[in-house]
Amino acid sequence: MEKSPDTFALYRIVGNDLYPRHKKGQTCENLKFILEHEPELENCEKKWIVNRIIDKEEELAIITQLHHHEQPFIHIPFHEEAYKVIEWDMNCLPDPGYLVSKEFENLDSEVRIRFIAAMYQLKNNYVMNTNGARNKALRDGRSRVKWILPWDGNCFVTRAAWKQIHIDVTASPHLKYFTVPMTRVVNNKQLLADEFTPRPVEEPQLIFRDDSIEEFYEKFCYGRRSKVELFWRLAIPGEWDCWKDDPWDQPRRPKSSEAGQFGAAGWTARLFSGMKKLEQDNKASFKQRGLARLEGIISTLRHVDVMIAGKSADSNTLSMYREDVLKGEERNYRSGKHLPHIDQLIADAKEAITRAPYSVTDKKSLPPSDNIHDYWHPAPYWWPNPNTKDGLPYIRRDGKRVPGTHIYEKKSDKYDRSRLQRVFDDSIILAMAWKFTGDKTYAKHGARILERFFIHPDSRMSPHLIYAQVRMGRNRNEGSGTGIIEMKDLYYYLDAIRLLKSAGVIKEDSFTKFKDWLSTYLTWLVQSPQGKKERMAVNNHGTYYDLQVASIADFLDNHPLLFETFIRAQSRIALQFAVDGSQPEELKRATSAHYCCFNFQGWVNMAEIASKWGIQLWSYRAPNGASLIKGAKWLLSYAGKEWPHKQIEEFDVERFLPIWFAVPQHLIKLPKSAKFPKSKYTVKPRFFPHDGVRPYWNLGLSRRDYH
């Protein structure tokens, strides 16, 4: 082997630009610079790997340049269908509840970014394919030359650099590996000057002899020691020997049998990334580069998720009612094929028009803040303390509601809960009545409700729920996190707004102000003590928190938050469902049948929003074996049977039906005990608001009738 000719093959792997680590278009710029200025290298052929470029225009520009310069290349294409089936890596979670734990909430920003990047590592490995492309180069080169250089696409080799590499490698042909340290430049043209002096102190590239046994470990993804992992196995010393692992990192593999069989050879240059502040040779810049790289990876992968889903979804697309199904139902209605549900919908809409638009300023009592604009509602199960003179602090009596806290009951006008529910329910009914009839009278009344409750300064609600579910004598008489659930039905109200906007009855200025209101409320929802507490809830409150955040983020085009919420929601499946599909947290309640159905209905709604963006929660199986499908099977197994767990109030057994018709039909069979109707249209369209079923749930529903 030592006497065989010293032939070389330099492979450059051209991948995706990652903003903010790279300037957009930097890959093409650097490729052009190399092709136009890099000299021929003695005994070395050059070849390129075009590695899963997402942007088809960018990919074409790269390939066109390579063809123009008659450069050979291997093309590894990006396939959307292959990417679609790749999930977030839930196996890296230290425990199923980690994303809703205090430990996660308290992570500093740098560690949090590293963890989120770890959740994306399976997607990262496909899109970036860093070690996969390096190994592709290695395998291609080993059959053709003695020395293979599987290098990054931004490596530039000057004549002087190559001369030194060639000297060092040929002087020690008994070695199987060589490290080639890198020098950074902030202006590529520096490399064209004869007097250029390198400072090669950056993480090296590697040279492999054709009989070397090692390859890059493809489970280590880009941005998290993809190359360093091989340094460790080959015992190549460097600052990486002091690096610590996070609990979610891939485990290190043992030393190679070829450890120590390496030398150092010359140097190479790393071309400019387009981000000058990240190209300094100091520890601060090194740290900033690492964070920018991870941010770029996460941003790029979220962009891919949105790019693929965006072909059929955007913020204007309905989240809960499928537009193609609604159009079919609308055509049938207008052609005279009246469904009883639509007739009932129109009747409900006519009744809604008789009710004046609502406002929080209509309530008969003031919140602890004395601000009439603040939403106000006491905690429903918290009563005066019989053991104290003033009744403070209040105590909990599960299953026993405080008068006025039950929707629409007598005295509920003292508070805002019933009024808020009217806003949600009347608005979606009015919007859908317009959709089916074309009569803008309905839509205009829906727009008036929006104006009075959310827009007009004299009547608008403050964009927070600080005084929702107040437990007097506790928490400075501010509400707890549990009060956030009172806004749970916002998700279908946002569909009502989408429909009203398409009807042309919402003024552009009002629409902008409503989005501003939502944005402020969303900030409070994410950052407030109540929001943080509710986010960490392990029961139905956590489900409905995620549903709110996801629906608002969807409406506002806040894709980073939207996909962050999808990840957190998916992680809750292992937390909320046992392997048999039961819901341990909900079974603790005095009205467990209600809460099991209520929580699962939240999951039905969450799965609908997620599917709009290409995330299939129904097909997900958690590492512990839990899944929504198992949850549905467990819950529906009690249809037609007596509920065996605690349930101190009467339970509406028809609540199983919206769940049954929502579950993808190919994933579940009808329980033998259940005597379910075959058509969703034969089931009642409205349930009590506490049940969590949206009004007219069976209109615009994508699932076909059961046969």
Map each language-model feature to its residues.
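N-proximal low-complexity "stem/linker" segments adjacent to membrane-targeting elements
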Residues: 1-36
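Short, acidic, metal-binding catalytic loop of nucleotide-sugar glycosyltransferases
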Residues: 26-44, 65-69
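Active-site-proximal specificity loops/subdomain of glycosyltransferases
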Residues: 57-145
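Active-site-adjacent structural elements in folded domains
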Residues: 120-121, 413-414, 476, 480, ...
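Conserved catalytic core of nucleotide-sugar-dependent glycosyltransferases
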Residues: 123-126, 138, 156-290
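Short beta-strand-to-loop acidic/aromatic patch adjacent to the donor-nucleotide binding site
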Residues: 144-158
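Extracellular glycan-targeting catalytic surfaces
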Residues: 313-531, 543, 567, 611-612, ...
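Long, repeat-rich segments with strong aromatic
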Residues: 544-646
